[in-house]
Amino acid sequence: MVMMAGMDDHERKIVQEFCHLLEKSKQLFNGLRDLPQYGHKQWQAYFGRTFDIYTKLWKFQQQHRAILDTKYGLKRWQIGEIASKIGQLYYHYYLRTSETSYLHEAYSFYAAIRGRAYYSRAAKEDRSDLMVKKLRYYARFIVVCLLLNKMKLVRELVQELDTQIADYASTYEPEDQVEWNLVLEEIKGFVKAESAVGVLHADSNPVVLTHRLGPLTSPPIERSPPMCLTLQEILIVGNSADQVKFSELSVDMFRMLQTLEREPRDDPTHMHDASPAGRLPFRPGPYPPENGMPRRENPHKYLLYKPTYSQVQVFLASGFKELPANGALLLYLSADGCFSTVKHPEEMGYDLGGVTTSNKRDPEHGKRLSGGKEPHCLYPGDLYPFTRKPLFVVVDSDNSYVFQQIPRYFGQPLMVLMSPQETPSTLRDVRHGGSLFTLFLHSPLAAFCLICNVGSLAVHHWERCQNYVERFLIEASRLVIRSRCDIFDIGL
């Protein structure tokens, strides 16, 4: 509780306004978790109000730092907490919009916390909850750095997190010590799996590879009248039981997410700034119109880690609903197979099985009755309603082939890309670190090196091989685009 005695009217008003802004920001931030994860109109206005209040709060504490330090007792970890909340806002806005520019904004505020050591005295407060805030900050910062391919910084942060967890455990002997050690192991396993092949400079330092879309990595596209579709909505589902993951993101999901994004544009004004001091968080606005239609840098994505059947259907329906004219929906499934016991299949949409969905939130409801279908399974027939609009399905599963018979009842474009059902015995252990099929989609050369047991190679060899891959992609793209459209009327 702040003591108002000993303050003049001006100081009292400043402290009261700060307390009001701080409390209002907490209320709005806590309300974010109640917003639906799907749709657009349902949450954009609320996010806008939350950004507005945090902008005012950040500006206010900058302008009145001296009074807040002496009269309110503002501590550095409290400033760090505000910066951390702003970083979280930008990260979650990225998740909801798929625009990578917001990742840079999140990175800027997270980097400021580390650069200015806002949490450096958290341990001296002798409060375990502050240490937990610090550990959570590290975990969130690592996720953002992973998505921005700042691997050198990721390794530094992992080492720092390791030290912080050890200090936390020795000081407080907390009940959640095992959970934090598990988080640390997940991060280390994820970083190890993510680098399927090591590319080295002449001095043996690793090269940071990027596999997002960019001018140098995307084949040039010749626009023609039949090319009227654009990818607008994406649903990425990860439900492989034995696969490395971190923060609700499996390795397969992480790779596919980057494969379907354009390379982030570095902002030179604060990419290397140690602090966001002197600048304000900006409120994300509507996408700039292009020819009267909203334009987005990237297709909108939903990321679902081990979702239930109901969740898959809800998010699919939301993406389907949001599709504009001439828009296409992409569904990516990385999941274990759900196999059928039907000896004489009649209904191809359900009798051959599908891929598993989670039952963790619904263990009792919908148990399989004798002779009935598995309720916690996504069947090919479940996708039939969504073929009313252009649909692209990518299935990475040991039961992928069952999706090859999806009919085109509504005459809309449909493509189904399926993984092999089996992996050579010598490569079966690889799936724990990510599916080979998804790795080929993400980085064909890295996948080729993996199956050839090439763990590392010099950067000049990598670049030479990559040139061959790019030449193939350019030629393949040219042939596909110039081919007759009706050859894609069947699922591939």
Regions found by a protein language model. Give the residues of each.
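Flexible helix-coil transition and linker loops at the boundaries of alpha-helical arrays
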Residues: 57-77, 115-129
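Active-site-proximal C-terminal subdomain of hydrolase catalytic domains
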Residues: 392, 396-492
